Amino acid sequence: MALSRLLSTLKSKVLYDDLSEESQKRVDNKNRKSLALSKRPLNQGRVTIDQAATMLGLEPFSFSDVKVNKYDMFIAKQDYSVKAHRKATFNILVDPYWFHQPLTHYPFFRVETFAMVWIGIKGRASGITTLRIIDKSYVNPSDQVEVEVRYPISKNFAVLGSLANFLALEDKHNLQVSVSVDDSSVQNCVISRTLWFWGIERTDLPVSMKTNDTVMFEFEPLEDKAINHLSSFSNFTTNVVQKAVGGAFTSKSFPELDTEKEFGVVKQPKKIPITKKSKSEVSVIM
């Protein structure tokens, strides 16, 4: 009997259940997302906010406590509104009363971290937002430090970065930020209120900053609508900024798979390469 069972086993064939068309689409989509994730610029994938802070040299700094390392960093918040097809341009606020200690005690500074949190946004807006930061302290445009981030409109958006060059107090008006929204579905105000969160390193001496040390992390659009609730603002840095920046690392949004347009960090300071991804690179050949 044992021999007959063995012979029947040897003659048997393994049956394969072909994936349905819907199941195959899910598998293909999962593979495309995994490949796109591995090819994200600069960080080659996701890292935690603690890892990002370490890579940026911000280990003592925490979004949850503005008093941490307060003698080296200061934090300010600005708010403004953005209209469709118009560029909202503003300068960083560096007035002494904004910070723990007068900025005149630290005449040199550089932007270390920045996060943008959209509080009020038209829910059905479907445009593209471009965020641009440029240091116009230099006469030669090729020497200017410029960063540009582009993403589809979402409830919230956060960016963590580090600009290499220091700025003097006299140059405070040369650091310009512009936000523009390209959206044909909205005629007027798209974002009714935005909070701009700065973390800036201060020093008594003009420390030499190498441009090729600049690191920029692109953060995904956030889908958590609860972050816009007024109750979240009882403790801004803990409940809003930290949640926005930390949650962005775990987001699963892949806008580059849905359109031919280029999203993410599309312009870096010079000497910082950006990995260009073609449509074929993010598609998996089965």
Curated annotation (Swiss-Prot):
GO biological process, one term: transport of virus in host, cell to cell
Lineage: Viruses, Riboviria, Orthornavirae, Negarnaviricota, Polyploviricotina
Single GO cellular component term: host cell cytoplasm
Disulfide bridges in this chain: none
The protein's role, per its UniProt record: Transports viral genome to neighboring plant cells directly through plasmosdesmata, without any budding. The movement protein allows efficient cell to cell propagation, by bypassing the host cell wall barrier.
Assembly notes: Interacts with the rice proteins DJA6 and HSP17.9A.
Similarity section: Belongs to the tenuiviruses pc4 protein family.
GO molecular function: RNA binding
Keyword field: Host cytoplasm, Host-virus interaction, RNA-binding, Transport, Viral movement protein
Organism of origin: Rice stripe virus (isolate T)
Subcellular location, record wording: Host cytoplasm
Name used for this protein in its record: Movement protein
